[in-house]
Amino acid sequence: PQEIFVPKGTILIDRTVVDSGEEERERFIVTHECFHYLLHPRCFRKTDGMGQYCRKENFNPWGRERKQMTALEIIEYQANYCAAAFQMPRIAVRQAFVTSIKMKGIPEKPLRFERWINPHISKLAKAFGVNFNPMKYRLQQLNLIDNGKRI
């Protein structure tokens, strides 16, 4: 490894993360890292002797079941959530979803995540310049589709 010097505030992304040639993935990663820079500047400003305090605590993503998460898991969730909201704005995604599945309005409860909905997710992902999974998770965050788990 070679040591390099960059100006303060520079965001470095390992080339292997974006070498796949997937422009959508690269765009999401860059947006995710920019939100780390904005939301968590102290977490990534390392000085000698500075430790990372990490513990599990209750965190309630999207108002659903509680999950024990470490501080690192929480800040990753926050950066992912903000990147998704930035690239796939709520109002635009809702409108595009309703148009794609030919509904008259926003569903009162999430639609069941079933195979027939996959082409719609793919179409929306392409329209918003993201991959399938980030779009699927965004639709779940917005309560437009469920998570596919059956009781």
Which residue stretches match the model-derived regions?
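Active-site hotspot residues in diverse enzymes, especially metal/ion-binding acidic/histidine motifs
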Residues: 1-151
